[in-house]
Amino acid sequence: MRIYVIRHGQSEANLRHAHAGWEQVPLTPKGLAQAAAVGERLKGIRFDKVIVSDLLRARQTAELALPSYAYQTDWRIREIHVGSLMGRLVADCTAELGEPYLRHRAQRDFTAYGGENLEQMQRRVSEFMDELTKEPADAQIAVACHEGAMYHMLCHVMQCDLPYLAAFADNCSVSVFTYRSGHWILNKWNETGRLIPEA
C-alpha cells in the first residue's frame, strides 16, 4: 500500500506569517496555482482513495489537484492546534508574549494557550497511520494535509523520538510512503518537481 501525501498550497496564514492551526484559512492565488500544478504532477497516478484534512486549505488543495476524485475528510491529520494563538501574527505574539512564547513555539507546545503539544498530535497522527495499514496491499491513497501532520507521519514511519527529527515540507510538495510486510518505508520526501510556481 502506498500513500502520496500532499501539503496544502500557500495559505493566507502562510503569506501573513500567522499561526493557522485549526483556523479555516483559504489558499492565496499562488496557493491555488500550486494546487493545480501538483495535480498535473500526479495526473498519471490512479488513486483508490483520497483522504483530506477537514481544514479549508487542505480541501481546496485536494479539489484543485484531484478534481475527478471524491474525498473523505479526517480531522486527525489537521495541523497542530495552537489554541488562542490561532490567526495571530508570529511577530505580534513575539512582541506581546516574549520569551515564554518563543520557548513554547520552539518546542511546538501550545498547551499554555489551550492548544496541543507534539505528543498529543503524534497520538492522533499515528492512529491515522495505523488505520491505513488495514487498506488493501495494492492500494494507492492520496492524502492532502499540513506540514505538521506530515512531520508526524515521518516520525511514525521512521520510529523516531520527538522532537529530534528536523524535517520541512514545502507548499504542495509530495511525499511518498509505502507499507509492505508489516513495515513502513519512506520513498520520497518534499518533492516539488518543476511544476510548483515560486512567485
Question: Language-model features: where?
Answer:
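Generic beta-sheet signal
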Residues: I3, A139-E147
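Loop-to-helix element that buttresses phosphate recognition and phosphoryl-transfer chemistry
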Residues: I3, R7-T61, Y113-S126
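General small-molecule cofactor/ligand-binding pocket signal
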Residues: Y4, Q72-D74, N187
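Phosphate-coordination/substrate-recognition cap region in phosphate-metabolizing enzymes
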Residues: A37-Y101
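Glycine-rich phosphate-binding loop signature in dinucleotide/nucleotide-binding domains
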Residues: K43-R46, L132-A139
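Short glycine/proline- and acidic residue-enriched helix-loop micro-motifs
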Residues: E99-Q120
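Domain-level recognition of soluble alpha/beta enzyme cores
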Residues: D161-I185
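Acidic, His/Gly-rich catalytic cores of divalent-metal-dependent hydrolytic chemistry
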Residues: N187-A199
